[in-house]
Amino acid sequence: MKFIHLAMTLAYSLPHIVDAFSTLSHQRIRTSNVGVSSIFTNSQRITTFSATPTTRRTTSLFSTTENKKSSELVSNQDLGLGTSGFSTSRIRNFSIIAHIDHGKSTLADRLLESTQTVAARDMAAQLLDNMDLERERGITIKLQAARVLYKSEVDGEMYILNLIDTPGHVDFSYEVSRSLAACEGALLVVDASQGVEAQTLANVYLALENNLEIIPVLNKIDLPAADPDRVAEEIEETIGIDCSDAVRASAKSGIGINDILESIVKNVPPPQPDTGGPFRALIFDSLFDPYRGVIVFFRVVDGAVKKGQKVRFLASKAEHDVTEVGIMQPNQVQVDCLRAGEVGYLCGSIKDVLDARVGDTITLSSEYKAAAAKLDPKSEEDPITPLPGYSESIPMVYCGIFPVDADQYENLRDALGKLRLNDAAISYEPETSGAMGFGFRCGFLGLLHMDVIRERLEREFDLDLIVTAPSVVYRVEKGEGDSKTVEIVDAPSKMPEILREMKVMEPYVRMEILTPSEYNGQIIELGQERRGILKDINYLTPTRSTIVYEVPLAEVITDFFDQLKSRTQGYASMEYQLIEYREGDLVRLDVKINYEDAPPLATIVHVDAAQTVGRRLVASLKELIPRQMFKVPIQACIGVKVIASASISPMRKDVLAKCYGGDLSRKKKLLQKQAKGKKRMKAMGKVNVPQEAFMAVIKLNKSAGD
């Protein structure tokens, strides 16, 4: 019996013993790999560990059964990326430019998926769009970058492809231009069913300004309405790019993805080799991490940077010690060094995103000081030449943001401060309104930027907000010659009431509208209503045309785009860019409610439209402001002159209801008592203006012809 019991015990324990030996052998294998670092092929997932937990890294390229050509391990030396003999000949830096809904983010997903940069289980729609807001709206707000390894099917060589995904909206055109400056090529993605759109043209012009090699990609060829031949001809006629070798693809279905990758390898030129000069890198984005500080994304142009060095940002003149450098796959992966031609990130315990502005140049502090020592102390020449194209982000649209609950003012201030950490283009300063209390006057790059920030404040920080009508930045010039002064006006309430001997300058934009030719008449009519100056009409094809206008920006930021879509049944698209400031015959239209000024409702309008806008604004406010127990007069004024007025009739209590008859003097006494009470209430009462009333100004701040 003892023997049988011992045999049963061994039989039960044997699987556990085998598992223990198996685990031990795996641990020995893992231990033998400590300190080994590799660059991995498309078909492998390998995790490497350094000797200390503090420097542990994970570098992964995920395996699938689809691609078995690249099963061998590729080392740094195989790619020419060793510490010596570094080569840039197999690096390709490219971007994707497209109009909204033409499939840019979907194509980026397919490129990451087909190269096994991201495993199928980790894939998600719009993978590079991290914010929920981006996925809901189908737009890219915050650009992303990803490093992809691809083994060419033509020459069998392994290539590093750095994809820099860019926002596509006109509000972020400067960020797009800096991202394109970090590339040598761009995929021009055009919907094969819709053809060339306005934002397509705008982004192509930016790419051409940066001398990028443009690869046309006709996307969505699997749609029933797709006509790639027509669209290819349209691209050639509109942009002048040869489309004979255009890649025909469908990002959704995965058609033509390998052709796109091969075209990138073949047509996009590699980065320029290292010239041996001082380290210089171009910043194309930054974000704030609560644990590591500001993370700076950049493209190395000359030299190299590694952990432990001190870097200097030329525009902000800030200096920081580098605590980490790495690449994006698309998750951040630490590396030892980044050299010329590579795209990566660095951390340096940077606390303010303004220290690392988009478009700024990074250099090594030691090299900067060495170069400065060789210059004449009186010389104004830069010791190290900054990379061209840098400019500071200038807000184009301003609005007031107030909390509905006055107790949330501190929360609003903290929320704006946190958003500012990730977005240096936001500007804000405290503002006080008698009607709405304490809030902030905020500046944005455009209407989309403003709308995105408002929605993030409400969604991420749980704030109830009142947002006033947006306004542009005006310039008021006083005097002439040496005594001339210029006052910047970013709010209607700051505009001087009396504009005698003053010039009011307003910003103008050059607007390019792409539309089916049958809607040309409606668009020209809309342009005339908005004080536009028609500059050009160009017929791309017999059925499509471009219309160029110069329009005051104030006429664009209201509902111009909505009107354009409405009058063209949604087929037209537009893009615009600021050109200059011009003198305008403008006046400040004030609103008084119950004889008290309401500064948030003030607006700046053209003098010819003031009468009409005033009447419509007063009528709209009359409908939106709730009735009170007393009569509420509403007035639209230019200076002291009332140009339109209306009154909200009071709610009336029937004080005679209890008098079934009797003495007339009793009724008069009750009516007189009621009148005295209403008079006192009118003198002391406050009128609460709802959010809808402020939004009404947005719709009414346009010319009288509309």
Swiss-Prot record:
For this protein, the record's Pfam families field holds: EFG_C, GTP_EFTU, GTP_EFTU_D2, LepA_C
The miscellaneous comment for this protein is: This protein may be expected to contain an N-terminal transit peptide but none has been predicted.
State the Gene Ontology terms under molecular function: GTP binding; GTPase activity; ribosome binding
- Reactions this protein catalyses: GTP + H2O = GDP + phosphate + H(+)
- Say where the protein is mainly found: mitochondrion
Q: Which residues bind GTP?
A: 98-105, 165-169, 219-222
Which PROSITE patterns does the entry link to?
G_TR_1 (PS00301), G_TR_2 (PS51722)
The protein in question is named Translation factor GUF1 homolog, mitochondrial
Instruction: Identify the stretch annotated as signal peptide in this record.
Output: none
- Report if keyword Disulfide bond is assigned: no
Protein source organism: Thalassiosira pseudonana (Marine diatom)
